[in-house]
Amino acid sequence: MTRLVTATEMQQIDNYTIETIGMPQDVLIERAAMAVLDVIGAGRFDLSHVLVLAGLGNNGADGVAIARLLYAQGVNVSLQFVGNVSRAKDSVKRQLAIIEKHGLVRSEKSDFNEATLIIDAIFGVGLNNVLPEGLQKMIKAANHIDKPVIAVDVPTGIDATTGEVRGAALKAHTTVTFGFTKVGLTQQNGCYLSGNVILKDVGMLIPDDFEFSLQETLPVA
């Protein structure tokens, strides 16, 4: 069983696992990417053309790793960044350096109509503001086309703590969340927009004296 966590609690657990325990961040990214691939493989998804939408933070780094693993399996995958890559976190840049050696070329702009599956790796638990207007428009266009979406950790636009929509949210068919289920996936619009929530253990650790603000428990895959 695992507990529900707020965005702040999840970030504290991340920091403890990486900074105190010494688990390399790239190991967690790889495990998260492999967990998403497990879900893709277990589902009946059309992999004719997978579009990975990646942000500039750690969620985006997960997305780049997912794109790489799919590409290595021979899947037709397009990787599109949302935002200026020059401002991406180091975790994203490290993943980019790897895919460049693999030969996977980033797409400047992709047509949602051509995609048979969309991977949402734009924003995760770190979202704390209303989404930019341009991103809101893109999300609304994607929702209108109604393609199957797998969200990485949390659907973009959903507040991981409250479940509120921050301007617009990408509606997911499936959400693969890591370590602990975020409260926002069970509250308000977050419950509806997250689709089928699958919890995956990627090796995160918690301090012995860590106190959860909520007591609910859910099964872990």
Curated annotation (Swiss-Prot):
Enzyme Commission (EC) number: 5.1.99.6
One annotated GO molecular function: mRNA binding
Keywords: Isomerase, Metal-binding, NAD, NADP, Nucleotide-binding, Potassium
Binding site for (6S)-NADPHX: N58, N59, G60, A61, D62, G124, V125, G126, L127, N128, N129, V130, D153
Biological process, per Gene Ontology: deadenylation-independent decapping of nuclear-transcribed mRNA; P-body assembly
InterPro entries xref list: YjeF_N_dom, YjeF_N_dom_sf
Disulfide bridge map: none
Domain of life according to the entry: Bacteria
GO cellular component: P-body
Cofactor note: Binds 1 potassium ion per subunit.
Binding site for K(+): N59, D120, T156
Pfam families, per the entry: YjeF_N
Named cofactor requirement(s): K(+)
Top enzyme class: isomerase
Catalytic activity, as annotated: (6R)-NADHX = (6S)-NADHX; (6R)-NADPHX = (6S)-NADPHX
Function in brief: Catalyzes the epimerization of the S- and R-forms of NAD(P)HX, a damaged form of NAD(P)H that is a result of enzymatic or heat-dependent hydration. This is a prerequisite for the S-specific NAD(P)H-hydrate dehydratase to allow the repair of both epimers of NAD(P)HX.
PANTHER family named in the record: ENHANCER OF MRNA-DECAPPING PROTEIN 3
Protein name, UniProt field: NAD(P)H-hydrate epimerase
Originating species: Leuconostoc mesenteroides subsp. mesenteroides (strain ATCC 8293 / DSM 20343 / BCRC 11652 / CCM 1803 / JCM 6124 / NCDO 523 / NBRC 100496 / NCIMB 8023 / NCTC 12954 / NRRL B-1118 / 37Y)
Gene: nnrE
